[in-house]
Structures are given as structure tokens and as C-alpha cells.
């Protein structure tokens, strides 16, 4: 068989797969007689209402000299680590706004950072294709820099996201531009499992984000530039447990819902979507039309402790607070006093749900606290 014939057969097979996928999508839509917001309205649910003092900017963390790309909270809620275009990780005291650590990175092109569950170490990765681990208790060297305690090398593309396995300081999961995710043993520095790559059920484009289930740490979700999200079990690296379709652009961010049975995705297509890992169904779409026709990309997301609220950062500087039940925007932090002056690149909620931190290309991080009659939702 000639190369031309092989290409033609491959194209025909690809078209058949796409046609079947579209038929499956339409059949699911026929069987799905309602979505989350439709059911909530039928039950008389009303939107969450925010007053002017219910979520206010209480801290501005200034110290980076470049765009802020990533942030993460410690489990005890008092500290934040941020990664910036200036080639530094900064650990902040969220209560006082003071910097407790400023780590100059071997590679300035950092894209992601994460706190360990104990809060004793931080991980980061970027265009050097390495996930670097720093022990915050290690003494600094003669030049005043924190030494790298472990370098996790093996990816063949940039490291786009990293997250420690809950309740473990010894394992971290990374996603990469090489279309794979990797589970690492930090103690040995070796790869425990590789998800994707040569396996056909893996992603077919750069993987942008991972989220590990807090209720079942063996499960994690990945989002990719192939417009899909995939559910993985760390015990079965050879295949994805389920693939979730629906987006029409790169999936930039994924986040598990608090109950561990659902997860959210955010995409370049301007939408966030809520999926059920048990049925594979899309439960809800969160999209706010813009009159100018411009569609801002979704860059980051986080659920409130109860899951009733969804915080979403956008490329145009908006930061919407969505009511997840009714799919309504109840607040836009990009339109209030002290809002960011650039793209919202990252955000995260404190462990107790009492504060939200946002990071931006304006080089600043801002901490937003629930006030008024709300303490957490």
C-alpha cells in the first residue's frame, strides 16, 4: 500500500470518527432534557446576591517586576506562592502582605508553581521542561539564593502545570507541552507513571492544566489544546478513563468540584463547562456574551467551598463570580474599585474558603475577602 493510500485511509477514518462523535453528541443532547440551571429554576432557586461589601480587596501584594503567571495557597491558608515573568518565586504572608521568601529560579521562564501539602516546599516548572522542588527550610547559599532540592527531568516540552498529590509531600503531577502528564516520586526524582504520549487515549496536543481530586487522590483531570479534558486514574496510566468533549478552543484550566464527582473547565472559546465524571455528561455551560463581539479567553478558575460559586479569570481583566446553579454572573471583580489593570492569569481560593487571591499581568496579586454578612459560601 502506497503512502498516498495510507493517508487517504487515515483521513477517511478520522472523518468517520468525527461524524460518530457528532452523532453521539446530538444523541446525548436529545436525552438530556435539562441542565443544572434549568432544574434549579424549576425548583424555585434564586441567584446569590452580592452587596458592595460582600467581596472586597483587602490586600495588594506588590513585589514582582514582571507578569504574574501562577499562584497557590498553603493548606493552612496564611501563605501564598506566586511565579512571575521576572524569574522569581515569592512566598507571601497573606495576613501581613510581607514576603517571607524570594527565590531566584535557574530558568527565568517559569509558568506554574504549587505549595506542598505541608507547606514546607514549593514546586515550579516552565520552558526548561523541568519541575524544580525547593525546600523552604533549606539554608540559602553564599549568593543569597535558595538551592534546588530536586529537579524532576523527563518531559520533552514545557511544564505548564504542577500539583502535589493531596496529603503527600512526596508525589507531584505535572502537565506538559509534550502532550503528557507525569506522576513523579520526589524522593527518588523518578517518573512513577506517564499518562498519554504513545498511548492512543492520551491528548493529541499540549496539556495545559491538571487538577487532582481531593476526595480520591488517585483521580485527576487534564485539559489540553486539543479542546478536550480527560479523566485519569494513577493506577492505570495506559489509558484515560474518560474523554470529555464540548469546547471549541484550547482548554486552559481544569478544576475539580468540591464533591469530587464533577469538574469544571475553562477555554479559549470563552466558556466554562461543568462535567460529571460518572456519566460523562456536560451539566452546564457558563458564558457571558459581549456586545463588541470579542470573546475573552478563560485563563483560570476556582470553586467556592460549597461549590455554589465559581470564580473565573479572563484575558481581558474580568473576573466573574458565577452562581453555578443558575449560570448567572453575580459579580465582576474586574469592574469594581481596586480591580486589576491587566489580564487575570491565575486565581485561587484559600483552604477555608474565606479569601480569594488573583494574579495578573499587571505584576500584582490581590487578596479579596468575604465581608458584610458573608464569611464563606
UniProtKB/Swiss-Prot annotation:
GO terms for biological process: G protein-coupled receptor signaling pathway. SUPFAM superfamilies: WD40 repeat-like. InterPro entries: G-protein_beta_WD-40_rep, Gprotein_B, Guanine_nucleotide-bd_bsu, WD40/YVTN_repeat-like_dom_sf, WD40_repeat_CS, WD40_repeat_dom_sf, WD40_rpt. GO terms for molecular function: signaling receptor complex adaptor activity. Keywords: Repeat, Transducer, WD repeat. Pfam families: WD40_Gbeta. One of its GO terms (cellular component) is heterotrimeric G-protein complex. WD repeats lie at residues 63-93, 105-135, 154-185, 202-233, 246-276, 293-323, 339-369. Belongs to the WD repeat G protein beta family. G proteins are composed of 3 units, alpha, beta and gamma. Guanine nucleotide-binding proteins (G proteins) are involved as a modulator or transducer in various transmembrane signaling systems. The beta and gamma chains are required for the GTPase activity, for replacement of GDP by GTP, and for G protein-effector interaction. This is Guanine nucleotide-binding protein subunit beta-2. It comes from Nicotiana tabacum.
